[in-house]
Amino acid sequence: MLKTGSWILSIWCAINGLLALIILGYVIVLRQDSPILQVAGFSPAEIAALSARTLGALNAFTLLYNSCSLAVSILTWPLIRRELVAGDQRAFWILVVVIGWIEVMAFWASAYVGHGRWQGNVLQSALYLAGIGLCASALFSPNGRRQARTTG
């Protein structure tokens, strides 16, 4: 169960990192405005009516958030693939706090834009809960600990 849970968490990392990288490329390389405007349902006319400072602030926050999101994905990947899969309970609790916080904040932030990307939030949260749940079962249940020692 520990290996399966860690693979599911690795999928969470890959999706999270890939989305962040795509958005960073969209804003930096393609020089487009933050995709949050489309997610929030702004029409092209509404976007055109926004001031340059407002668009600049949205783009800055988009770059900052997605840079951090990409960094979290890169930093949690080895934590999952090495420490967690080896049965390290500290790695488990770090991932509970870090990824759990991100998932809660994703839903909270989504509320500000009418839950425009709720499907992505649900998918990411389902992956997180399934992965962390399987890992918890393997690390903290008596049968799981025994299995982790013999197969880990």
PLM segments and residue spans:
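Membrane-helix boundary connector in multi-pass membrane proteins
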Residues: V104-S125
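A loop-to-helix transmembrane entry motif
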Residues: L30-L37, A52-A71
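Residues within membrane-spanning alpha-helices of integral membrane proteins
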Residues: S6-N16, N66, F92, V96-I99, ...
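Juxtamembrane helix-break-helix junctions at the cytosolic face
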Residues: S73-F92
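Aromatic-anchored segments of alpha-helical transmembrane domains
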Residues: N16-L19, I99-W108
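Membrane-interface helix-boundary signature
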Residues: M1-L9, S51-F61, D88-F92, V113, ...
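Membrane-water interface at the C-terminal end of transmembrane alpha helices
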Residues: L129-T150
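Cytosolic juxtamembrane helix and N-cap/initiation of the first transmembrane helix
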Residues: M1-Q32
